[in-house]
Structure formats: C-alpha cells, structure tokens
Amino acid sequence: MGIKQYSQEELKEMALVEIAHELFEEHKKPVPFQELLNEIASLLGVKKEELGDRIAQFYTDLNIDGRFLALSDQTWGLRSWYPYDQLDEETQPTVKAKKKKAKKAVEEDLDLDEFEEIDEDDLDLDEVEEELDLEADDFDEEDLDEDDDDLEIEEDIIDEDDEDYDDEEEEIK
C-alpha cells in the first residue's frame, strides 16, 4: 500500500517513523533527514515548525527501529536495501586528505632568528634557589595555627537521630 493511498486523517494518526518507512518504500533511495522531515510535513499538511515537538522522538525512533540505517551525512535508508557485507563500506565515513602545503607554510613563517638563544652556563640556579628559600622563610606558621583554631569541632552536639537510635536499642533489650 503506497503512502498516497492513505487518507489525511489516517496519516495524522500514523507514527512519523511509519510514514518514513512508507516514503522509503516508495522512493527506493536514501534520503537526507531534513528532506525526510519536509516530505512528512507536506504529507501531513503542516509546517515543519509544527512538527518541532515530535522531531526528537522521531529521530530516536529512526535510530532504534531496526528497519532503518543511518548512512553518511545525515542520510537515512532502509536496512533491507543493503546486503550485510556492503553495510560497512557504505556507512564508514570518508577520511579527508590532509594538506601538506599548509604545514610547510607554517614552518616557513616561523623565523628562528626571532628567538633569543639561552646559554645554560649563564643561568645562575643558585640565585633562583635563594629567592625560593626567602619566600619560604616569609611563610608564617602562626597563620596555620589561626586557621586550625577556626576549624575546631564541637563534640557536644548530639544528633536527634542518634538519640532515637539509642532509644530503639533499649527497647530491643
């Protein structure tokens, strides 16, 4: 039964995934998702925006329903059209070739004369270590003690749940 044989009322009662299946059966070729939505909207006599609430569920149904197959570039088709061996070849994305010229251009733009050479012998590591030691001496342990005073925990607080638990233990005995 073709999609055109359904009445407008029957189409509106059908699930979008069923309408899509009928469209694929009729066209016998893969269709991009947006085109599929446009065709369904025109068949139902509504604007694509009016389908907005149902689009997410429709896309989910297409993914879950075993009759449909997602091909490259948001294109969908029926699984029955593709033999099992051909599925991997059809659905694998194409890898774009990398441009080697762009990498060479970046290397040419990089001017090594702009960078200053540093001689490791000129570096005075002792001076850096002394600066770090001075910063460590500035650190005051009294500051830590003050922070610890702020964190003292009151042990006198008893949670009501603990009291209820104690009462239950006494009742059991």
Curated annotation (Swiss-Prot):
- Biological source species: Bacillus subtilis (strain 168)
Q: What's the stated role of this polypeptide?
A: Participates in both the initiation and recycling phases of transcription. In the presence of the delta subunit, RNAP displays an increased specificity of transcription, a decreased affinity for nucleic acids, and an increased efficiency of RNA synthesis because of enhanced recycling. May function in sigma factor switching. It displaces RNA bound to RNA polymerase in a binary complex.
Q: Does the keyword Transcription apply?
A: yes
Q: Which residues form the HTH HARE-type domain?
A: 14-81
Identify the stretch(es) annotated as Disordered.
Answer: 110-173
Subunit-structure text: RNAP is composed of a core of 2 alpha, a beta and a beta' subunit. The core is associated with a delta subunit, and at least one of epsilon or omega. When a sigma factor is associated with the core the holoenzyme is formed, which can initiate transcription.
- Indicate the family of this protein: Belongs to the RpoE family.
Q: What is this protein called?
A: DNA-directed RNA polymerase subunit delta
